[in-house]
Each structure stands twice: as structure tokens, then as C-alpha cells.
């Protein structure tokens, strides 16, 4: 399969730069997997689409203020984007500079350059940085970091983004991008879903900056997926198995929840799914046999991205590309701060190719 098979025309005007004033009032395009039928509505229509006993699986990662500005002690300006916190003192990061820093380079970070750090090692495209500060890394980031808005949101981050670019149930700091399907859930909608008898469970996948990296090969089978840390604890496994046993659906909120659940299923030795704690490089594209999820809530993704490939593997290539064409025609808002889709599984998708 070629990467260009997953291309589509997207007017710049449809890229959302700010979220809707009310989280759950975004538009919702529903795609019926088996038939390809499309229905237009709003996000709160989920209340009618979900049944008592269905299981929603959320990603409770919390976005960290991962973008830092400063300079090398020798003078050159730098921009640091944290990829992963290694411990209380060290990070792995992307560094943008006119000249890449060498091990031992001192970095002065923050508006007043009061935070001192040292680049200690290089690991491929990533730099290991150690802070020379008594505070833990997370406190430093909260003090001087900027929210790492995606590259297609062409504006500086604002104070409001610290909450808007966070799910209301975010709990575990570590992501450098939000699990954006979850941004549409507010407390009243969550309460209404609970009241209806919809079950909820939480995985953790710390979304890395690699999620925004373009696919740089022509043939998708040649693509090497970036690595991200995921946790699928025992209580999630129990909830999934219980939902399946009673004939209910497992509904992933976002592609990160999909990748967490399917990673846990791939690694399982005997059961459908078992607890999983570790890095995952799972790459889902047409031909993949889904093991766990029955429905998916997700935003609209970039052309030629691994995420539109994941959706195509679930709903079928033709149904997915037709839905995206319709979304553009109907002026849905795209990407992180945009509108959402509710998709049910297409059992024929596994045998369909572009």
C-alpha cells in the first residue's frame, strides 16, 4: 500500500485553531462500519448511541508543558521539546538549534535563563538532558514550559491552552500531545453516561511528539512506528473481559486507547487481553485484525498519517475515505481542536485494500 492512497484535499480554513466554547457541543459524524452509512449530529448524541453495559476506554494521560526556550551557554538560541521524562532530573528531548549541541553543552532555559541544564548524551534524533536544579523535572516544566500545541495550530500557546488542551479526566502527566478524542467529554456528559449505565475504564499512553511526524516512506509497510509508553492495568483487562462476556461493546476513546488495548491483546499469552506495561510501537493499517475494540470515537486526522490508516483498518478503506470527503464537503473542523467521529467496526475491513 502506498502512503499517497491515504491523501485527501483539506482546505486550510477547516483546521481548527481553537476548540468549541463548550466541549461536548462539537459536531459528530457517525460512520456505520458494515454499510458505510453516515449520520450527522452533535457529540452529545453519544448518549443515544451507547447502551447500558457498554464499556468506554479512555486514556488518562496528562499533557505536560513540554516546550522550552533558551540558549546554549555559548550563545545560540535553542528550542527544546520534551519527548519523555526519564526521571526527576532527566529528559529525552528534540532540540532545535542552528547547530546541534554536543554532549557536555550547558543550556540556559526559561525567559530569564535561570534554569541550567546539560546535554549529556545523544540517542539518534533525541538528546538526553539533565537539569542542574533541586526541583523535579515536572515542577520545572510547569514553571517555564509552554503547552506543545501541534504544528498545524499556527499560533503561540496561550494560558487557556493549559486546560483546553487537556481532557477533564487527565491524571498522569507525561504526554506531549493530548489524546484529542477525549477533549469533547465534559463532566455533565460523563455524568449522563454513567447514569445510563455506561461503564468506564482508563488506560495510560503518554503520547509522544512522534505522533506528528510525517510518514517518510512511499510504501506504508516500510514505515517504522515511533515508540510510546502504555499502561493497561488489571482492572481494565477485567472490565474488557466482563463487557465481552455480557455481550456489550468495548468502545475506544481515541486512537491512543486503541493502540493501548490492541498492544495488550498482542502481548497476551493465553487470554484475549492481559495487563500491559511497557513501550509499544504498534502500527495499525489495513489488513490488521482488531482483537478488542467494537467501536471507536476519534477526531479527524491528517492526510497520509498513521492515524487515518488505523481508522481505515477499522472501518474499511473506501468507507473511511468517503467519510473524510463528506466531512470536508460539510465543513467539519479538523485535527486536535476539531470535530469528532463515532465509528462501528466493519468486519470486512481486514480484506479490503486501497
From Swiss-Prot:
GO terms for molecular function: S-adenosylmethionine:tRNA ribosyltransferase-isomerase activity. This is S-adenosylmethionine:tRNA ribosyltransferase-isomerase. The keyword Transmembrane does not apply. It is found in: Cytoplasm. Monomer. Its EC number is 2.4.99.17. The gene is queA. GO terms for cellular component: cytoplasm. It comes from Salmonella typhi. Pathway: tRNA modification; tRNA-queuosine biosynthesis. Transfers and isomerizes the ribose moiety from AdoMet to the 7-aminomethyl group of 7-deazaguanine (preQ1-tRNA) to give epoxyqueuosine (oQ-tRNA). Signal peptide: none annotated. Gene3D superfamilies: QueA-like. It catalyses: 7-aminomethyl-7-carbaguanosine(34) in tRNA + S-adenosyl-L-methionine = epoxyqueuosine(34) in tRNA + adenine + L-methionine + 2 H(+). It comes from the Bacteria. One of its GO terms (biological process) is tRNA wobble guanine modification. Belongs to the QueA family. Keywords: Cytoplasm, Queuosine biosynthesis, S-adenosyl-L-methionine, Transferase. InterPro entries: QueA, QueA_dom1, QueA_dom2, QueA_sf.
Amino acid at each position: 500500500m502506498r502512503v499517497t492512497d491515504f491523501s485527501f484535499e483539506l482546505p486550510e480554513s477547516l483546521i481548527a485553531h481553537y476548540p468549541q466554547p463548550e466541549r461536548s457541543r462539537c459536531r459528530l459524524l457517525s460512520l456505520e462500519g458494515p454499510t458505510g452509512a453516515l449520520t450527522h449530529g452533535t457529540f452529545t448524541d453519544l448518549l443515544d448511541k451507547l447502551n447500558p453495559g457498554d464499556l468506554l476506554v479512555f486514556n488518562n494521560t496528562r499533557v505536560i508543558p513540554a516546550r522550552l526556550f533558551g540558549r546554549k551557554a555559548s550563545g545560540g538560541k535553542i528550542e527544546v521539546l520534551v519527548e519523555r521524562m526519564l526521571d526527576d532530573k532527566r529528559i529525552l528531548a528534540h532540540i532545535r538549534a542552528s547547530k546541534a549541541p554536543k554532549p557536555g553543552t550547558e543550556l540556559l532555559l526559561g525567559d530569564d535563563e535561570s534554569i541550567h541544564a546539560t546535554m549529556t548524551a545523544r540517542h539518534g534524533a533525541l538528546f538526553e538532558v539533565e537539569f542542574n536544579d533541586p526541583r523535579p523535572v515536572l515542577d520545572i516544566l510547569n514553571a517555564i514550559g509552554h503547552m506543545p500545541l501541534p504544528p498545524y495550530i499556527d499560533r503561540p500557546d496561550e494560558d487557556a491552552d493549559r486546560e483546553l488542551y487537556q481532557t477533564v479526566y487527565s491524571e498522569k502527566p507525561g504526554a506531549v500531545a493530548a489524546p484529542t478524542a477525549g477533549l469533547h467529554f465534559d463532566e455533565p456528559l460523563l455524568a449522563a453516561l454513567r447514569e445510563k449505565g455506561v461503564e468506564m475504564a482508563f488506560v495510560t499512553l503518554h503520547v509522544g511528539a512522534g505522533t506528528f511526524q510525517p510518514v517518510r516512506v512511499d510504501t506504508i509497510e516500510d514505515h517504522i512506528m515511533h515508540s510510546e509508553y502504555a499502561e493497561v492495568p488489571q482492572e481494565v483487562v477485567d472490565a474488557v473481559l466482563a463487557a465481552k462476556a455480557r455481550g456489550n461493546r468495548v468502545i475506544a476513546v481515541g486512537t491512543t486507547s486503541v493502540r493501548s488495548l490492541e498492544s495488550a491483546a498482542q502481548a497476551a499469552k493465553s487470554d484475549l487481553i492481559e495487563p500491559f506495561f511497557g513501550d509499544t510501537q504498534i502500527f495499525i493499517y489495513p489488513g490488521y485484525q482488531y482483537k478488542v475494540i467494537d467501536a471507536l470515537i476519534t477526531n479527524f486526522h491528517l492526510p497520509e498519517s498513521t492515524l487515518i490508516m488505523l481508522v481505515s483498518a477499522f472501518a474499511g478503506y473506501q468507507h473511511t475515505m468517503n467519510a473524510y470527503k463528506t466531512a470536508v464537503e460539510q465543513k467539519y473542523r479538523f485535527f486536535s481542536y476539531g470535530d469528532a467521529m463515532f465509528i462501528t467496526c466493519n468486519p470486512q475491513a481486514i480484506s479490503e485494500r486501497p
